[in-house]
């Protein structure tokens, strides 16, 4: 009954669906609750009904946004698997390859690289993407063998309630794995694997020394990996603390010390060496005082760190953004433009990327292209009040040719000679607010 309570409190569609199907299968296979618990069972159903009727739960269960995002996850996963059909992109590499196929439609924090997606919320698709047909066949074979063994056990002794319960657990696990990620949830997967071992006993006989030796070997390897994970997490936390304090030297030192063959990414999929690039760039800029002028001789070390970060994670949005900014600071506008374009191919609505791409286009004299970017940009209020954005708008509107074919921009051809910069910017923002939906 604790399990039933946990299912009710989970308030997730996959658990409720899996629990319902598992209960239905258990009843179909002959399980009947004892008389003294039937009232408790009916009470649980009543609680489930009341929860389902409550506003917050209905909003959570019926919200289509999660399903829409999952469709993006799955579509990108199928693309990964199609490019690497036999062996997949490699264990743990889904989160690296996911941005390659585009972040449009993702939450703003994901589109900006503040957070990242690390799994597709479907373990079968996840295994197929990371380990290809080979891994998927083995994963499916594992479940098929459990089902076959469970069916045989049930047929031999239909009166044994444990066999029906095990079949129901398999259904619940299968449904849950189709919409979530039990493979990465130890609280779910460890008990399930223990039950799988318990119900599968009596198979191939091995000498006691052999399976004990294998058990100790696997436990030792798991312990080694767990120890490295704990150590890595501690060093990564030091990097994040230095970064939050903006201690340039400390960031570079802690980030370079943290990198090892065991540890290249933090928990948010940021390459650790990226932080070294930020620390180096920040420190060099600080050392040059106020209003410095940067040239091609500046930020060489930071550029090297960013290149190392992109070698680890080629589609890392934040590294691409900061590398493009680095080129812009050095007035290397051609490379800045190319890098912003690479960023925006991955994350078309990246706010800083859109704004500074327009700034770069202005610097190259491509004012109409800059104006087109700005009029279509989805930005938040903090960007609209940014002086860089305001200057970019005015410069693009005043510099674009009168022959522009963009109907929206044609509106400003006549008024730009009559309005001062502040009024021209305000007119642009008014037009934009009527034309473009507000960024979420």
Can you name each region flagged by the protein language model?
Residues 1-5, 159-170:
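Short hydrophobic alpha-helices at membrane interfaces in multi-pass membrane enzymes
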Residues 4-19, 24-83, 91, 96, ...:
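A membrane-periplasm/extracellular boundary helix in multi-pass inner-membrane enzymes
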Residues 16-28, 143-146, 190-198:
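Hydrophobic transmembrane alpha-helices of multi-pass, membrane-embedded glycosylation machinery
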Residues 65, 79-83, 91-129:
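Interfacial juxtamembrane loops and adjacent helix segments
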Residues 128-131, 164-192:
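Membrane helix-loop boundary segments at the extracytoplasmic
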Residues 133-165:
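Hydrophobic transmembrane alpha-helices and their immediate junctions
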Residues 156-161, 195-230:
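A juxtamembrane structural motif centered on a specific transmembrane helix
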Residues 240-440:
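C-terminal luminal/periplasmic domains and tails of membrane-associated envelope-modifying transferases
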